[in-house]
Amino acid sequence: MAEDDLCSLFFKLKVEDVTSSDELARHMKNASNERKPLIEPGENQSMDIDEEGGSVGHGLLYLYVDCPTMMLCFYGGSLPYNWMQGALLTNLPPYQHDVTLDEVNRGLRQASGFFGYADPMRSAYFAAFSFPGRVIKLNEQMELTSTKGKCLTFDLYASTQLRFELGELVRHGECKFAIG
């Protein structure tokens, strides 16, 4: 299947009729709660512990890239290198109504040092992941300026394990940041 066809299919699978970050958070929380029994160990079940010494639960984390990159990575089951040490994710929700796409792109470019974020379309698509125990919270944060001039701070996370299981992908779609 051609890359355009894959993108077309991917766009059809996005969350529909969600217009605010609160609605998206509720929708994702419900989906995450439905999956919880599948991703958390039950009593007396073994669990893989990452090299850092324990399982870390960060809730949903978001990856921002363009649709063709997303399709190539997901078709292959791996995250893209969007940071010099692997994949950079954040807890910034993709339907944040008081932040523009340009500002998000600026923050991602500054945080990652990735030249690809020079074009806002490089972060116009999101994927929400649930990575129990597979990410490291970085000491730095992404600071953005809202459309009202407020400083907004979001955490940054890194994953050097770029392979992912299909069940770790919770949602994906087109970002709905403010137009500015």
Swiss-Prot record:
Keywords: Cytokinin biosynthesis, Glycosidase, Hydrolase. It is an enzyme of class 3 (hydrolase). GO terms for biological process: carbohydrate metabolic process; cytokinin biosynthetic process. It comes from the Eukaryota. GO terms for molecular function: beta-glucosidase activity. Its EC number is 3.2.1.-. Hydrolyzes cytokinin glucosides thus liberating free cytokinins. This is Cytokinin-beta-glucosidase 1. It comes from Panax ginseng.
